Amino acid sequence: SLEIQVLVPIQEHNEFNFNLLKIESRLKQDSYFVHMAKKTYPDNEPYFAITASIASFERTLVSNQSRFDYYLNGLGTLNDQERLGMELFFSAKTNCSHCHGGFNFTDYSFSNNGAVTIKNDSGRYRITHLTSDIGQFKVPSLRNVALTAPYMHDGSIGSLKEVLVSYNKGGNNKAYTQNHLIKELQLSDKELAQLEAFLNTLTDYNFIQNPKFKH
């Protein structure tokens, strides 16, 4: 759940590396927080209000006004390059949409996309201890992907173009748990540019410029 996910970046050593109880202690000094926490979650401890309220906010972060969305709903157009990139994205030639499908361009699964360096982070294996999970990470949404560099779970790829080049050659790491769909695609530079153009249409400026999300 999102409530559980909230705990990860707070406590993970390579993210915030902090302690939820220390956050609770600090927030107890804030009379407004204490008042709102009791009002909203009267039967729960303050630390519950922290995770529950952050998760509630995260559920409001819905992006659905990109150029692609307008095109899909008959309210806008894509140019030829973007349209050809869209056709490639949803084609059997690339299989991009196999993992990055649906409204949020993710199937919410875990997968090894050939970017992992096992010695630094073994992925889902850290939790399950199943060898089949070595190098598997959550498939991310591609909405607003043009704005979220650097890419991959470890930030090892600096640009969207480099990501596409990596997939085109079948990944950067041939680990044995790599998804069977990650293989050489043999796309031309022109086709890679078309894919990148399509991915840029997933940017939702109404979402990213919403003043409610600035803080």
Predicted features along the sequence, with ranges:
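Periplasmic c-type cytochrome electron-transfer domains
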Residues: S1-H215
